[in-house]
Amino acid sequence: MSTTKLTRREQREHAQRFIDTLAGTAFPNSRRIYVHGSQADIRVPMREIQLSPTLVGGDKDKPRYETNEPIPVYDTSGPYGDPDISIDVRQGLAKLRQPWIDARNDCAPLSERSSAYTKARLADDGLDELRFSGLLTPKRAVAGKCVTQLHYARQGIVTPEMEFIAIRENMGRERIRSEVLRQQHAGEGFGAHLPENITPEFVRDEVAAGRAIIPANINHPESEPMIIGRNFLVKVNANIGNSAVTSSIEEEVEKLVWSTRWGADTVMDLSTGRYIHETREWILRNSPVPIGTVPIYQALEKVNGIAENLTWQVFRDTLLEQAEQGVDYFTIHAGVLLRYVPMTAKRLTGIVSRGGSIMAKWCLSHHQENFLYQHFREICEICAAYDVSLSLGDGLRPGSIQDANDEAQFSELRTLGELTKIAWEYDVQVMIEGPGHVPMQMIRRNMTEQLEHCHEAPFYTLGPLTTDIAPGYDHFTSGIGAAMIGWFGCAMLCYVTPKEHLGLPNKEDVKQGLITYKIAAHAADLAKGHPGAQIRDNAMSKARFEFRWEDQFNLALDPFTARAYHDETLPQESGKVAHFCSMCGPKFCSMKITQEVRDYAAKQSIEAGMADMSNNFRARGGEIYLKQEEA
């Protein structure tokens, strides 16, 4: 990892150059494909990795090859992964879902913004240079209508978003013909239902039951539909956002694009610094993935960082502001109740959630119940009008191994289950946030408790970190826990970067965190037995055994690092066709030796077969033609 430290000005200039030169880019030897649905505007993007053929025989002059079919993989990069699409972040992305939203005739443009804060920002000419120029006119559900995907699902309606998701979740595996690639071990799903083929109707059923959510605000039409649920692929979230001391709008847009390139299924904007409103607008207009926020952060900024001065009115205005910009899901810490706060007094690390600590301080200062809990039904009404999903925050999550699975954590979890049922009364989509810091032997209980008390709503966890002794490597400590809880049924994993507990992550940290968590999510899919999850592994193993080095690089989650590590010791082009690597060398490569053994065994088998035929021939008297026996 590079240790070169850029100045603040250099970081911002680098981000500006990135934005100015941004273009759709494919991974090495990959191409963008689109799988079409039942109507012309359902075009589901995937990345197809092209592979080289396998040498199967012949001689030096006339070698004989066998084709290796391309491998389709899930792609979160949106237009940024398509070289044929022109990118201009100042214009934003195409509004993919706008025709679907308009066709439902259940929402209408607003004549003015509902948020007083938004109105004030728009009236401030001093912000013109920072403001995204192509502002949308926000929409809201018309009176008496509900615009959530949960509402449609409960009405028996299969939306275009649901069909898009069904195609996407199947990952193009119906295109794979090779029996070698299709082989897969049986998994242990711990009660998950994983059909061989995901249909739009199955997606609808899961959403209707509350077991899955489709974060898709009607004011974020640029987003490509995706789903979060135990019976689908495990998803990964990346956190970005500025702080009071670092980052800029340019850098956050760069981190957004970078996150989607490296596999972020959703992105949370956790900005706490200046220009939060303007930064979020730039992010939303350029994001092909759902965007989540923690509204209490911005609400706190509006009262100058003094938690005691927070009010429901300020928070409500913040919800309206963000919903009309297009935020797809809100983290709401409504389960931090006044009576739970004393339970944290005996903890080693107390309350470590920012949102949880803000609400705990407010409750103690006023000696009143959490206003998010008291006004939860009003929160649901707002979410239902824009289709903002709720991510019920775990404000009392454990911040150390010592505090794992304690009374405070599980008391809050049970309250989140109660709030889930209330949200469902309003047809609002819900997922539940989880820990945190949990040792390996205690992780599964978190999943079983959540399923029981939160009625199978999707679980979304931060890790969990399995040990506290590795600052600088907490993407590893948490990746272990993430893989485990993903296997047990967690639907989405919030990444942890190497900077966890140390500082705000930069672009390279974002990549490191995402690669770690894509590994964890994929390992969980394999363990669950998700249909088709093993195809890419099989393709990699076949390429590895056949010494197809270029294919090994290209099939990797990070082709660039794989190639760089190989080329550190074998940089010559001849090293890309060598039947060994620098680990063992030519004489001790186990796969080379195995191939020689296999070839020898095959040759021996042929020779033995020829000998048997020769013996049979002589036993029959050496006659070329045998007389037919009479009946």
From Swiss-Prot:
It is an enzyme of class 4 (lyase). Its EC number is 4.1.99.17. GO terms for cellular component: cytosol. Residues 58-67 have a biased composition (Basic and acidic residues). Binds 1 [4Fe-4S] cluster per subunit. The cluster is coordinated with 3 cysteines and an exchangeable S-adenosyl-L-methionine. Keywords: 4Fe-4S, Iron, Iron-sulfur, Lyase, Metal-binding, S-adenosyl-L-methionine, Thiamine biosynthesis, Zinc. Substrate binds at N239, M268, Y297, H333, S353, R354, G355, D394, G395, L396, R397, E433, Y460. [4Fe-4S] cluster binds at C581, C584, C589. Catalyzes the synthesis of the hydroxymethylpyrimidine phosphate (HMP-P) moiety of thiamine from aminoimidazole ribotide (AIR) in a radical S-adenosyl-L-methionine (SAM)-dependent reaction. This is Phosphomethylpyrimidine synthase. The lineage of its organism: Bacteria, Pseudomonadati, Pseudomonadota, Gammaproteobacteria, Enterobacterales.
